[in-house]
From Swiss-Prot:
This is Pollen receptor-like kinase 6. It holds the Pfam family LRR_8. ATP binds at L390, G391, N392, G393, S394, L395, G396, S397, A398, K412. PROSITE patterns: PROTEIN_KINASE_DOM (PS50011). It comes from Arabidopsis thaliana (Mouse-ear cress). Its main location: membrane. The lineage of its organism: Eukaryota, Viridiplantae, Streptophyta, Embryophyta, Tracheophyta. Residues 27-266 are extracellular.
Length: 659
């Protein structure tokens, strides 16, 4: 019997049918383990109702799920939902391409679940839960692809598992704020890819391995481990008693060879010293109070850690000019508390020498208004304001002052313009005061003296992007959603485009763009500050104070340009998207993340998704937009400025990104 001849088209039909059927089968197979995972835990602060069996987890509708190329589940990011119960890791083994698990800020407890069964994991983030107990020493031996491990702010006990030090690709390890004991494995110092090691706030003991201290490009935090000594922690080991582990004694702790009688004598001496010190402060307080009564016309606005002080000395009016200025200050409510007629003289400097002076009403000692959108005020109004130190920046110190009218302002004392003549300073300040753009912080006023320059601007209650992104872990930080971060990036881009048009003739229209100079309004609208200062600074001061001088081109050619501002914009874009503090902001480059190298290498390997801050990843569609924006940031930080986007093109591409 002749064999039947099959039409080749039949095989093609079978092949096409298999392709058309396989995606739906993939959806079903991946939705089932996710639904089982959802059913195994309790949710107290939200829901996962979008997780429905038989639907496509990669449709963009499943909360907290993101997918690789929109086809297969690669990440589970379920945070702040009050999850509790038992995680069955076996359910997740049916997700073959799962790379990231993020369950931080929940209520999960008990021993660490058996995540070692998921050998393909690259990121495991379990911060801020209540996991407890010891972690098996060999727990991580099969997780060779793991890059980021966050176990911080839990209740883990025992020693650090040695298998962690055998993870060849590990870049970040966070185990701070647990109850870990024992010594730090020296093998951390030989882990080639390790960039961040945070073991702070534990009960670790012994000598910090020299290999960790010697490792370059490693950000280490070992603070609040009482019994550690040696390098990194800067605690000598002379007073550390290393116990014989065979004796079963507790971990090594500081010991003392001083007899008990000597201790009692020392305590008595300390008590006597404290009593004398208290008596001294009482005497000083009495003297100060008497001096205040004799000299009520001297007030200190603020001081900082470097003993810089902001002082305002009020002297009796003694000239016709002073009389006129006093009259004008009375109209503004600027007379002194005791009803006497005063004139304002700024005295801002180290040690409060009390020198210098000039009449109000436009004289050397007055506040010059350049923007009256928030009303007018004078130096006496600032003098009567409650003031506090905000901090020190690369250009000087900043102080917050709340005036009696309720207006809160920031007074920035700029230390690197002391040799600047009055005329160029006046011209620039008045020009700044005319700027109007929703993303530019326009100064309200300024004060000129040969020795001191002050710039007054409106206070932003949400502070800077730097603080909200890295320093605050409260409500402000939690509100930095993907939509909010995109709004900030686009606002910064619009502001920079405006500055590059307004100051097109300047080498650096901004020159100092970084997250500390991006302030946030109540609605998270970004306002750019500290711009266009280059013409006002001495070249030597500018190269030290302005961030644009940390660009690759300045290091290579000692030149800066408009493209240097583009580089700074790229750093901010990447900082916002990754949530990482850039090491580029630090003078010594130690600490933070080398965000340029990290991004460039990941983009080259087409691993952009791994760079995105897990806190803002919700679905596949938003991930696509984030990656697109990240590529714009990467195009802004090319080492060769000729290969960077120009500002106009960068802004155009940023505007195209939608939430």
């Amino acid at each position: 019997m002749a064999a039947a001849v099959l039409n080749p088209g039949f095989f093609l039909l079978i092949l096409l049918l298999s392709f058309s059927i396989s995606p739906s089968l993939q959806y079903v197979s991946e939705s089932e383990p996710l639904v089982r995972f959802k059913n195994s835990v309790k949710i107290t602060k939200g829901d996962l109702n979008s997780w429905r069996e038989g639907t496509d987890p990669c449709s963009g509708k499943w909360f907290g799920i993101y997918c690789q190329k929109g086809l297969t589940v690669s990440g589970i990011h379920v945070t702040r939902l009050g999850l509790s119960g038992t995680i069955t890791v076996d359910d997740l083994k049916d997700l073959p391409n799962l790379k990231t698990i993020r369950l931080d800020n929940n209520l999960l407890s008990g021993p660490l679940p058996h995540f070692f069964k998921l050998r393909g994991l690259k990121s495991l983030m379990l911060s801020n839960n209540s996991f407890s107990g010891e972690i098996r020493d060999d727990f991580f031996k099969d997780m060779s692809k793991l890059k980021r491990l966050f176990l911080d702010h839990n209740k883990f006990e025992g020693s650090i598992p040695s298998s962690i030090t055998q993870l060849p690709q590990l870049e970040e390890l966070h185990m701070q704020s647990n109850n870990l004991t024992g010594e730090i494995p020296p093998e951390f110092g030989s882990m080639k890819n390790l960039k961040v090691l945070d073991l702070s706030t534990n009960s670790l003991d012994g000598i910090v391995p020299q290999s960790i201290a010697d490792k370059k490009n490693l950000a280490v935090n070992l603070t609040e481990n009482e019994y550690l000594c040696g390098p990194v922690v800067d605690v000598g080991c002379e007073n550390i008693e290393l116990n014989d582990p065979q004796e079963g004694q507790p971990p090594s702790k500081p010991s003392s060879s001083v007899p008990e009688t000597s201790n009692k004598a020392a305590i008595n001496a300390i008590m006597v010293s404290i009593s004398l010190l208290l008596l001294f402060f009482i005497i000083v307080g009495v003297i100060k109070r008497r001096n205040k009564k004799k000299n009520p016309d001297f007030r200190m606005l603020a001081n900082n850690r470097e003993n810089d002080v902001v002082e305002v000395r009020i002297s009796e009016s003694s000239s016709t000019t002073a009389k006129r200025s006093t009259d004008s200050s009375r109209k503004r409510g600027g007379h002194s508390d005791d009803g006497s007629t005063k004139k304002g003289v700024s005295n801002i400097g180290k040690g409060g020498n009390g020198g210098g002076g000039g009449a109000l009403g436009g004289g050397m000692g007055d506040i010059i208004m350049v923007n009256t959108d928030k009303g007018s005020f004078g130096l006496p109004d600032l003098m009567k304001a409650a003031a506090e130190v905000l901090g020190n920046g690369s250009l000087g110190s900043a102080y917050k002052a709340v005036m009696t009218t309720g207006l809160s302002v920031v007074v920035k004392r700029i230390r690197d313009m002391n040799q600047l003549a009055r005329e160029p300073f006046d011209v620039e300040m008045r020009r700044f005061g005319k700027l109007r753009h929703p993303n530019i912080l326009t100064p309200l006023a300024y004060h000129y003296r040969r020795e001191e320059k002050l710039v007054v601007s409106e206070y932003m209650p949400k502070s800077s992007l730097l603080y909200v992104l890295h320093g605050d872990r409260g409500i402000y930080h939690s509100e930095l959603t993907w939509a909010t971060r995109l709004k900030i990036i686009q606002g910064v881009a619009h502001g920079m485009k405006f500055l590059h048009e307004e100051f097109a003739s300047y080498d650096l229209p901004h020159g100092n763009l970084k997250s500390s100079n991006v302030l946030l309004s109540e609605t998270y609208e970004p306002l750019i500050s500290d711009y266009a200062f280059l013409p006002l600074l001495q070249p030597s001061n500018a190269s030290q104070a302005l961030f644009a001088f940390k660009t690759p081109e300045f290091a290579q050619t000692q030149q800066v340009s408009h493209k240097s501002d583009v580089y700074c914009l790229g750093i901010i874009i990447l900082e916002i998207l990754t949530g990482k503090f850039p090491s580029q902001y630090l003078n010594n480059g130690k600490g933070g993340t080398d965000i340029v190298q990290w991004v460039q290498s990941s983009v080259a390997e087409q691993k952009e998704e791994e760079l995105i801050d897990p806190e803002i990843v919700n679905n596949t569609e938003s991930m696509r937009q984030m990656v697109e924006l990240l590529r714009v940031g990467a195009a802004c930080i090319a080492s060769n400025p000729d290969e960077r986007l120009d500002m106009r093109e960068a802004v155009r591409r940023i505007e195209q990104v939608k939430t």
